[in-house]
């Protein structure tokens, strides 16, 4: 796929331009310099044409620290490999020595370049005061745009497409598929894991290519379902440790199951509906929760349950009571043998993965915190100042408090509930908490 790179000195609006062209708020936009450190990329689709767009950090003429130097090196290396560069300058203030230095590097790199004058909301002023000096950079006619106000972006896109097609690049191909969602199917022996695994793979809409596995190892299958890529892992049944002989194949298979959970994004926990929820089911669910993996709970063999039409509430209550520590998981009733509700399992996996990879703004967290603390009594002497999300997979939140010692399990339950009820439900995903002392 053709790659188009956005480059320029800091704070000329590169990330705003990137977000508008990909039609997502993917790159962080702030007024301060150096907000973008790592390259951010996404696919641009425009009238059936597609290309990869990459937003880079601002290139400093003379980096003042090691990080800035490394950022500059990464950007300059990417320029050499790009099919096309969008060289963004400030359409209000004109060019500086930093612009001239970067222009010199671009010319020496012999890379195709489009000169983009951003922040050109006042076109007459731009034409009169800024445009004439831009020709000195050596890239011909500049394209004036205002990313913030969506001015002239169509003209820019037309020019990009034209330049790429002149190079003979294929723009008709579909966007590259992102990394696969890794799904492990786990449970006790004989609960129907392999049957569910096969039911998912046998969907008519699924294109399956096998990844070779080894006997007693987890069996992997790479699957495309509705354009999404998954790797499903069918694992061996997990028995209680006391029932597994040491130094046996089963013992090592259990290690492999745990390893599969570690490598998964989403774990489907399969239960035998004819047997309810056993202690071993609870242990397996606890293992998944402690490893911080997203989860979906499946009551399989639902076709064998007597009077099943009237027993959904009964089994849902059982789930909430015995697997209360993962009660955020979607609950699905299936018969893998008959193909019942396999679609719902796939939908639940997608939901859990979306939650697992969601990041919420700090403003939403602290607004909810302020609102709830107004009518909540914390332990005497405890103060929670503010919080922010610091990671995904799983969603992890850092709260600044005056005393970490006063944070006990009830306070952790309170904060998780606050996040799910007032910020984002994170259905299917655990929430991890961290605390830092602050005054």
UniProtKB/Swiss-Prot annotation:
The organism's taxonomic lineage, starting at the top: Bacteria, Thermotogati, Thermotogota, Thermotogae, Thermotogales
Residue span(s) of domain KH-like: 358-439
Gene transcribed to yield this protein: der
Ranges where the EngA-type G domain occurs: 2-168, 181-357
Name used for this protein in its record: GTPase Der
A Pfam family this chain is assigned to: KH_dom-like
Function: GTPase that plays an essential role in the late steps of ribosome biogenesis.
Subunit structure: Associates with the 50S ribosomal subunit.
Source organism, top-level taxon: Bacteria
PROSITE patterns: G_ENGA (PS51712)
GO molecular function, one term: ribosome binding
Family: Belongs to the TRAFAC class TrmE-Era-EngA-EngB-Septin-like GTPase superfamily. EngA (Der) GTPase family.
């Amino acid at each position: 796929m053709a790659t188009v790179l956005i480059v320029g000195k800091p704070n000329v609006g590169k990330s705003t331009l990137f977000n508008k062209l990909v039609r997502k708020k993917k790159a962080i936009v702030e007024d301060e310099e150096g907000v973008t450190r790592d390259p951010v990329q996404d696919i641009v689709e425009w009238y059936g044409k597609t290309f990869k767009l990459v937003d880079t950090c601002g290139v400093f003429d003379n980096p003042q620290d090691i990080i800035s130097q490394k950022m500059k090196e990464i950007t300059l290396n990417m320029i050499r490999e790009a099919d096309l560069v969008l060289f963004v300058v400030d359409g209000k203030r004109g060019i500086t020595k930093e612009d001239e230095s970067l222009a010199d590097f671009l010319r020496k790199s012999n890379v195709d370049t489009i000169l983009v004058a951003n922040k050109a909301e006042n076109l007459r002023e731009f034409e009169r005061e800024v445009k004439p000096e831009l020709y000195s950079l050596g890239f011909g006619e500049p394209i004036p745009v205002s990313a913030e106000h969506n001015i002239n972006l169509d003209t820019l896109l037309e020019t990009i497409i034209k330049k790429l097609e002149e190079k003979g690049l294929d723009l008709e191909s579909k966007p590259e598929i992102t990394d696969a969602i890794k799904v492990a199917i786990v449970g006790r022996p004989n609960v129907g894991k392999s049957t569910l695994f096969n039911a998912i793979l046998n969907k008519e809409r699924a294109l399956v290519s096998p990844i070779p596995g080894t006997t007693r190892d987890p069996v992997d299958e790479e699957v495309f379902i509705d354009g999404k890529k998954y790797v499903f892992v069918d694992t061996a049944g997990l028995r209680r440790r006391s029932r597994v002989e040491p130094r046996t194949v089963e013992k090592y298979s259990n290690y492999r199951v745990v390893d599969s959970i570690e490598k998964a994004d989403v774990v489907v926990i399969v239960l035998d509906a004819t047997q309810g929820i056993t202690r071993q089911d609870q242990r397996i669910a606890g293992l998944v929760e402690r490893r911080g993996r997203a989860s979906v709970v499946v009551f399989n063999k639902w076709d064998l349950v007597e009077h099943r039409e009237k027993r959904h509430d009964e089994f849902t209550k059982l789930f909430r009571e015995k697997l209360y520590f993962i009660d955020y998981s979607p609950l699905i009733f299936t018969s893998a043998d008959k193909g019942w509700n396999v679609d719902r399992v796939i939908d639940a996996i997608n939901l859990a993965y979306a939650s697992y990879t969601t990041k919420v703004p700090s403003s939403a967290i602290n607004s909810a915190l302020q609102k709830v603390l107004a009518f909540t009594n914390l332990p005497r002497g405890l103060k929670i100042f503010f919080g922010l999300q610091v990671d995904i997979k799983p969603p992890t939140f850092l709260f600044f408090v005056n005393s970490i010692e006063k944070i006990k399990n009830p306070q952790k339950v309170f904060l998780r509930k606050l996040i799910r009820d007032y910020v984002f439900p994170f259905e299917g995903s655990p929430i991890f908490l961290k605390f830092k002392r602050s005054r």
